[in-house]
Amino acid sequence: MRLPAQLLGLLMLWVPGSSGDVVMTQSPLSLPVTLGQPASISCRSSQSLVYSDGNTYLNWFQQRPGQSPRRLIYKVSNRDSGVPDRFSGSGSGTDFTLKISRVEAEDVGVYYCMQGTHWP
């Protein structure tokens, strides 16, 4: 009979909006681009993303139309295997940027920043 109460307690830990939540804000929300030209997206965190081990766990994901998201960049500036070098990540603390040096047609999609430093 204690199990439901325990489950409720666990679920309450994951309620968004509780104190300590990290808010990630991207801009711009929409970006018209020209093929062959550069593009950049900014991401700001409400708290520093520097973890106690000294690493900054900020990831960038790309979701092409009709596909699942794939990670492009991890720990701010490290490209995942197979990601073209026209993609680069930079930043520190609370402010981060994803840059595409020369936009290609296959780059159309939705881009997300995600932090992995603070968990509920």
Curated annotation (Swiss-Prot):
Residues 75-81 are annotated as: Complementarity-determining-2. Residues 44-59 are annotated as: Complementarity-determining-1. It comes from the Eukaryota. Immunoglobulins are composed of two identical heavy chains and two identical light chains; disulfide-linked. Residues 21-120 form the Ig-like domain. Gene3D superfamilies: Immunoglobulins. GO terms for cellular component: blood microparticle; extracellular exosome; extracellular region; immunoglobulin complex; plasma membrane. Keywords: Adaptive immunity, Cell membrane, Disulfide bond, Immunity, Immunoglobulin, Immunoglobulin domain, Membrane, Secreted, Signal. Disulfide bonds join 43-113. It comes from Homo sapiens (Human). It is found in: Secreted; Cell membrane. The gene is IGKV2-30. Residues 60-74 are annotated as: Framework-2. InterPro entries: Ig-like_dom (IPR007110), Ig-like_dom_sf (IPR036179), Ig-like_fold (IPR013783), Ig_V-set (IPR013106), IgV_Light_Chain (IPR050150). One of its GO terms (molecular function) is antigen binding. This is Immunoglobulin kappa variable 2-30. Residues 21-43 are annotated as: Framework-1. It holds the Pfam family V-set. GO terms for biological process: adaptive immune response; immune response.
